[in-house]
Amino acid sequence: MLDLVKELGVTCVRYPGGNFVSNYNWEDGIGPRENRPVRRDLAWHCTETNEMGIDDFYRWSQKAGTEIMLAVNMGTRGLKAALDELEYVNGAPGTAWADQRVANGIEEPMDIKMWCIGNEMDGPWQVGHMSPEEYASAVDKVAHAMKLAESGLELVACGSSGAYMPTFGTWEKTVLTKAYENLDFVSCHAYYFDRGHKTRAAASMQDFLASSEDMTKFIATVSDAADQAREANNGTKDIA
């Protein structure tokens, strides 16, 4: 895996990824592996052993030469858990969570700057699913507090789960307008793959290759929402 990541030139990897994060307790993945609890994973209806945690992923990223984008659980948790996690990861020794990191074998702060606040919270399949207004209020509070705790963070709001969502575009405009001052990026979630029409292999590949046109429209819609949010706030910065 490490060799493949290096060969591909991957520069940044999100952790934890996907729907999993909305029911994830980051504290479960630190300390000795034999002491870590096994939990139910509500996203994929299985059990999570927590054999891989923040410390382990940080060490892996050091070997892989990649930066980390840490994802915050906005499904079952929120503000307090995010601040504790930030302290554990980036805090200088001398506070409870930072000292716990040192005790777990990582003396220096990890200095992780990019944080994704939630994952696909517009999706009804997501644990803690929210309306645009609910997520806008929640992400604004979490992002504001995180930037009070540490300057220089780059915070990412979760955008729509796809262009097929009924609130696509409206979601981005609502969220970015409310939390404009505290956000830096919005994520674009779009998945393209060869759908494998057995009797239409050539057509299937053509559809797949044409997906770049759909992605261009997707980005344009999100960019337009970001521009409207900037104008509504009389702002000068661009949300990417």
Language-model-detected regions and their locations in the chain:
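Non-catalytic accessory regions flanking glycosidase/transglycosidase catalytic cores in CAZymes
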Residues: 1-171, 176-185, 212-240
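Short glycine-enriched loops at secondary-structure junctions
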Residues: 19, 189-192
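Active-site His/acidic residue clusters
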Residues: 192-207
